[in-house]
Design a protein with these regions (language model features):
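Glycoside hydrolase catalytic-domain context in secreted enzymes
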Residues: 4-756, 761-779
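Short beta-strand elements
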Residues: 779-792
Length: 792
């Protein structure tokens, strides 16, 4: 095997390697490079290490968790000797100031400079000049650089029911990350929000497969079509966490799920499928286990279903430390070599090993040399990884052809990273969900004497949640773990500053005593909710407003003045006395611009249009149930998956009877639906167009979100009372009407047919169905209009 000695100065020479010739096809370039690679070089491509392994810790070891730049010795060790092919920026891995201008670091320019340092070293010093691929969690915008505008967390984006907003959010994220070189984005989360206790609920779009599918697919397209130059990809999107990650039996992160295969096929898989069908280049694996088999070691999940049934062709990556966890946590193998063999043979192409490049290299080579992993399987995985790198243009960066040039233009990175503020504001405005508005207390008069109070009134930390500047969020002294630099507070508007900008009469009361002492108050705006958290640190057996927040609301209610509660949270929470407040707004963790958006709604500049993408339980002790549940839960302490069937004698406690149902949200106007028209017949592999009229019967222009549901009166298997099959957003001026057309595929009616052991893909059963539009009330399944149709 030749030892290639090409250098950047020789880029135009005829003898340059075929894989560096941009005139060749990607397939030809991959073939040429793969043929030249040694086995250690190949297994190195299958490993992803934390960026901090490239920095020097005390005592000369590589692996500092501080905020230092990579150094030559550690880059040599990890990138050249261990031949690591991918680098991860973990939740706390923000770069220091790299400009020499005395800044506080963690800007777009700093991220680009860090990338240039690492990438140039890898390209110039590796035998075959193979660039590294850089991965980062960017779940609601480029969440690391402190100056970047952030979008609402995904559950808030779900409340917009706006695929355009999801696409724009992806495109703005891609613009920012691509400008800094970090072109592998670990988003979107396509898990379903079916258990409020789970600490990652806010990272999901919705509890419903159709809504999550539509938004996730749009987000993938936004991420991957920010085109630049000759390459088709903006950045690589990652559908995660395949599959069923959110379904743990106890609401804890990275835990066991018990999933009937029919439920997996008909309910859990569709949202992942939508992201894959939208073109997602990569898939990340569920960290938990399903039916006692770790997903990372499941050939059935990662090969039979993902590759065979779904036809996925891209890269499969494990989540953080999940391959070694097969040995250390799941105990299904005695050593790391065995863990690697199980994961790779199941279908994992790259391991997010993060800490131990040498351990990966040694154990992976042992697995191949012992025959536990075949050379063909290694080549298959590396071929996928190299294809991704070529598609992203990593082999055609300026620094590949001329070592004196940077890989990305760091001087342009800040502009790209800080763009998107107007788009984030629009998404926040669309997300806000009005849950209660007694006696039309809202909107408030623009000059009203508003008193703003509550622990989340002036907290960018609580407003943004996790994955914002740092893993556990923006710095706040009340938190204990893993937050950003206290100097790095993102620019934007809190609820307080947003209200004060809109109303010069507004005053801030820091605590209950000062709020009660504000005798001139005409209304109280109380901003409450959750503190920032991420992953398992957010798991909560009974999510609810804390006692001090509930006490504040109750004390203000005694004054007799209007109390408007603004909830800033990543999931529905038990409201306590807030449930009887004069008005309740759910603002989610609503972006850096959420304060302005809240003020726009409070004072009537914006008519709220958001609708719940997730059911809101009656109290914190209940998980809430799912809108499309079908049967009592078989899981003991989990009334989370299913509704109680009528008349089965188990009492009302397990019925779908939330405080606010899926799809609910009020407006400052009223809408009427009429003239519903549905095709009388539909092919099982076809689609149909639903038509109806929307009339704005109020005095304010507004946007109506209309979910379209289907009921199957009789069938061979138990089906939900209603299934969401489509939805639309329609803007209608006061007093006007619009005819609306909504198209849906018959495949949305699919179910896994057969007996208890059924496990195949969903099929559409012939028979009679009823299409339904619901009333916008707190009563579940209250039908407004309906029409029958037949599938044949």
């Amino acid at each position: 095997m030749p030892s290639t000695a090409w250098s950047g100065a020789e880029a135009s020479a005829p003898e340059q390697p075929a894989w560096l010739d941009s005139g060749n096809s990607v397939g030809k370039r991959v073939d040429a490079l793969l043929q030249e690679m040694t086995l250690p070089e190949k297994v190195g491509q299958m490993d992803q290490q934390l960026v901090t392994t490239l920095t020097d810790a005390d005592g000369g070891r590589c692996g500092d968790f501080g905020f230092n730049m990579p150094n030559t010795e550690c880059m040599q060790k990890i990138l050249i000797e261990q031949q690591t092919g991918s680098i991860l920026a973990g939740g706390t891995n923000n770069p220091p100031d790299t400009t020499g201008k005395g800044g506080i670091g963690n800007t777009g320019e700093d991220w680009a400079n860090e990338y240039n340092t690492i990438q140039s070293f890898a390209i110039q010093n590796s035998r075959l000049h193979i660039p590294v691929i850089f991965g980062v969690d960017a779940v609601h915008g480029f969440g690391h650089p402190w100056q970047a505008p952030l979008f609402p967390q995904s559950i808030g984006m779900g409340a917009t029911w706006d695929t355009g907003a999801a696409l724009t959010g992806g495109a703005m994220t891609a613009k920012a990350t691509k400008a800094t070189g970090w072109t592998w984005v670990f988003a979107p989360v396509q898990d379903l929000a079916r258990d409020n206790r789970w600490g990652r609920t806010y990272e999901t779009w919705a509890e419903q497969p159709v809504l999550a599918s539509a938004l996730g697919a749009a987000n993938v397209k936004g991420l991957q079509t920010a085109r630049g130059g000759q390459h088709s990809l903006g950045v690589a999107a990652t559908v995660k966490h395949f599959a069923g990650y959110s379904q743990s039996i106890n609401g804890h992160d990275r835990n066991e799920a018990l999933l009937p295969l029919s439920y997996l096929q008909s309910t859990i898989l569709p949202s992942y499928i939508a992201g894959i069908d939208a073109g997602a280049e990569t898939v990340m694996v569920n960290s938990g286990s399903i039916n006692s088999v770790p997903a990372t070691a499941s050939h059935y999940l990662l090969t039979d279903i993902l590759r065979g049934q779904l036809g996925f062709k891209g890269v499969v990556i494990s989540d953080y430390q999940d391959v070694p966890a097969l040995q250390t946590a799941y105990h299904i193998t005695p050593d790391l070599s065995g863990a690697i063999a199980k994961a790779v043979n199941a279908g994992v192409d790259m391991s997010m090993q993060v800490f131990d490049a040498a351990g990966w290299q040694t154990a992976a080579l042992q697995a191949v040399q012992s025959g536990a992993i075949s050379q063909d399987r290694i080549d298959e995985a590396v071929r996928r990884i190299l294809t991704l790198k070529f598609n992203l243009g990593l082999f055609d960066q300026p620094c590949m052809k001329d070592y004196s040039k940077p890989c990305v233009d760091a001087s342009a990175a800040n502009d790209a990273v800080t763009s998107g503020r107007a788009e984030a504001l629009k998404a926040a405005q669309e997300s806000i969900t009005l849950l209660r508005n007694q006696n039309n207390v809202l909107p408030l008069a623009a000059d009203s004497n508003v008193v703003v109070t509550g622990p989340s009134a002036d907290s960018m930390t609580n407003q943004l949640g996790g994955w914002s500047v740092s893993w556990q969020g923006v710095f706040d002294s009340g938190h204990v773990c893993c937050m950003g630099d206290p100097k790095q507070i993102p620019p934007g508007s809190t609820v307080l500053t947003g209200i004060q900008a809109a109303n010069s009469n507004a005053v801030y009361a820091r605590d209950q005593a000062s709020a009660l002492a504000a005798s001139s108050a005409s209304a109280y705006v109380v901003a409450v909710g959750e503190k920032a958290y991420a992953e398992g640190l957010g798991d909560n057996p009974a999510p609810a407003l804390p006692p001090d927040q509930q006490a504040l609301i109750a004390a203000l209610q005694v004054t007799g003045k209007p109390v408007i509660v603004v909830v800033l949270a990543g999931r529905p929470v038990g409201l306590g006395p807030a449930a009887t407040a004069d008005a309740v707004l759910m603002a989610y963790q609503g972006s850096t611009e959420a304060g302005e958006a809240v003020a726009d709604v409070l004072f009537g500049k914006v008519n709220p249009s958001g609708k719940l993408p997730i059911s809101w339980p009656t109290d914190a002790a209940k998980v809430g149930g799912d809108f499309d549940g079908t049967a009592p839960s078989p899981l003991g302490d989990q009334p989370k998956f299913f509704d109680q069937l009528t008349g089965t004698g188990s009492g009302p406690g397990h019925a779908y009877n939330p405080l606010y149902p899926f799809g609910f949200g009020l407006s400052y106007t009223t809408f009427q639906h009429s003239e519903l028209k549905v095709p009388s017949r539909m092919s099982a592999n076809g689609s149909g167009t639903v038509r109806f009229k929307v009339t704005n019967t109020g005095t304010v222009d507004g946007t109506d979100i209309v979910p379209v549901y289907v009921n199957r009166p009789i069938g061979d298997t138990v089906t939900p009372t209603q299934r969401l099959v489509a939805f639309t957003r329609v803007a209608v001026k006061a007093g006007e009407s619009k005819m609306v057309s909504v198209r849906f595929k018959a495949s949305a009616l699919g179910e896994t047919a057969g007996d208890i052991d059924a496990s195949g893909p969903p099929t559409v059963q012939p028979g009679d169905y009823v299409l339904q539009l619901n009333k916008n009330t707190t009563t579940p399944y209250e039908v407004d209009l309906s029409a029958k149709f037949t599938v044949n």
